[in-house]
């Protein structure tokens, strides 16, 4: 079996923020992934919805991690990296690779997700479990628990 070079895994990144203070504990480097299937009326990042756009860039884990490390001295003991979106789970392989490499450096890793791509199927759970093994905190963004209101607010069904 060939070992994966996680540093070379690529993802479509919309943008990054070097000094986030609301997406997890402490000061954080935020990676906003491109793509989301929900269309929330109150979305802060509607420019991340499209799966591809001229505003996003395909980047390697190594590239994103090197950018993040420039700001590590601001994180203190509580900060780290948060991956958000768009919807981070649409690019689960990239997020898993990024967190795997970050954990090797002792970096706290937070996943910000609405869990829309999540599926309770064995083949998905294997991939999802690999991500959870390298995730310190999940910020689960539950949009609405009433099915009718959820559709009105997000243009998508509740699926979990």
List PLM regions with ranges.
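Conserved Radical SAM active-site core
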Residues: 4, 27, 45-133
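Radical SAM enzyme core and accessory elements
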Residues: 1-8
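Conserved radical SAM core fold
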Residues: 88-89, 116-119, 138-154
């Amino acid at each position: 079996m060939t070992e994966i070079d996680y540093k070379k895994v690529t993802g479509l990144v919309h943008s990054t923020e070097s000094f986030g203070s609301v997406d997890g504990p402490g000061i954080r480097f935020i990676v906003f992934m491109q793509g989301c299937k929900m269309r929330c009326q109150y979305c802060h990042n509607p420019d991340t919805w499209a799966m591809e756009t001229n505003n996003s860039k395909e980047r390697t884990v190594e590239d994103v991690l090197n950018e993040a490390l420039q700001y590590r001295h601001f994180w203190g003991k509580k900060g780290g990296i948060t991956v958000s979106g768009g919807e981070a789970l649409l690019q689960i392989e990239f997020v898993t690779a990024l967190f795997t490499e970050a954990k090797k450096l002792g970096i706290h890793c937070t996943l910000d997700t609405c869990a829309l791509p999540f599926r309770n199927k064995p083949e998905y759970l294997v991939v999802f479990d690999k991500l959870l093994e390298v995730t310190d905190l999940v910020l689960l963004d539950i949009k609405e628990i009433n099915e009718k209101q959820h559709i009105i607010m997000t243009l998508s069904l509740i699926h979990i």
